[in-house]
Amino acid sequence: MNLVKLSCLALAVAAAGSQLAVAGQAESKGFVDDSALKLLNRNYYFNRDFKNQPGSQSYREEWAHGVMAEFASGFTQGPVGFGVDAYGYLGIKLDSGRGRAGTGLLPISDEGRAQDEYGEAGGAAKLRISKTTLKYGEMRTEAPVFATAHSRLLPETATGFHIASGEIEGLALEAGHFTAYNNRNSTNSDEALYLNYGSGEVGKTIDFAGGSYAVSDDLSVALYASRFEDTWNQYYGNLNYTLGISEGQSLNVDFNLYRTGDTGDALQGDISNTTYSLAATYALGSHSILLAYQRVDGDTPFDYVGGDSIFLSNSMQFSDFNAPNERSWRIGYGYDWAGLGVPGLTTKVTYVKGTDIDGTDADANGGYAGFYGEDGEHSETDIDIKYVVQDGPAKDLSVRLRQAFHYANEDQGEGDLHEFRVIVDYPLSIL
């Protein structure tokens, strides 16, 4: 396992610099004193209404409550620090039905009914030398080529090795080797890795390495590479720059690029895909306006492993606007109501239009054949309203309303739908 060897080598090199290691560990207060225990209560209502699918389940509606406890120990003192991370998640059905299940909030039985409750627990062992940390076990990840999601009730987790290093100021490096996945509505932490769009057999492991560097307070860059066994090699780059125009006025430019090509046994068929997005956000006081363009160059969609591994500007509430050869444009407006004396209240309205979809040249023996037509197009309008309590006994409690309207022609494939979500989060820091 090359990644594990690399991780051990990196830790050995860090240990060799004993002065640096001792200095880094000297800041540790110990296993107990640096420990943190956090609790999150999440109440989630999800409604999705398909408008043009008479031959299948066209309506999904569920309501559930989740309780998530996460513990992170400190590190033992000394040149090498040891610690553990642990979590326990519980999901409870409040309302569902056989004809309304399938929102992703709750597991579904063989009879098509949502389970009354489900839960999971896990953890990871960790060690630290200086500012380099190695973990093994079940964890959440945030890399642009492999990121677990928390867009439904309970978080996703992945099982494997992860190493992160911050030895150089402004430079954050990480690498990972993962072999199993726990999906958002599952209690099985030993499930296979999965694709969001492909079908059929996929690789059993994913490896990645990369990092980000803050060139200045206004400019940052990121580079990553990953290998999904016998499926693809994927590369990612990001450039983010903020121009301060005047007091309360700024312009942010964010560029993201993915390059994906099949490798090994090519279990998903031939893949040669370059996808990028360019977004500009102008902020003036409490107002913000966003314009973005996204392009997919390839006969397969831009696909990804894990629920949140898509760092592109036009990935929306429902659609990712990532179909073969798709071009999409986005415009959005946001307002922070603190400007009118209501701190904690924010609103956003976004519209995206995607055209030129053509998936007819996808590998006929691959995992994406037959998904898209020759002249697909679609649009999505999202409305997002969120309020966070600023003080008092309910401080940090948030209420979020999300509405999406998606319309598509037959060649696009996702169909017409209306989707509404209500998410209430109440985080607590116990330790």
Locations of the language-model features?
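Surface-exposed coil loops of outer-membrane beta-barrel proteins
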Residues: R98-E117, G122, T132-S212, A222, ...
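Outer-membrane beta-barrel translocator/channel fold
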Residues: E174-Y197, G248-P324, S328, Y407-G415
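Transmembrane beta-strand segments that form the barrel wall of outer-membrane beta-barrel proteins
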Residues: N43-Y45, L134-T148, L173-A175, A209, ...
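Residues that define the transmembrane beta-barrel architecture of outer-membrane proteins
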Residues: D33, E61-V67, E117-A121, P155-T159, ...
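C-terminal structural cap/anchor segments
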Residues: Y293, G298-D375, E380-V388
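Repeated loop/turn-to-beta-strand initiation elements of outer-membrane beta-barrel proteins
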Residues: P79-G81, K131-K135, G170-E174, N182, ...
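Residues on the lipid-exposed face of transmembrane beta-strands in outer-membrane beta-barrel proteins
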Residues: L39, V67-S73, G123-L127, F161-S165, ...
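Beta-barrel outer-membrane channel/assembly domains of diderm bacteria
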Residues: C8, A14-T141, E247, I383-Q390, ...
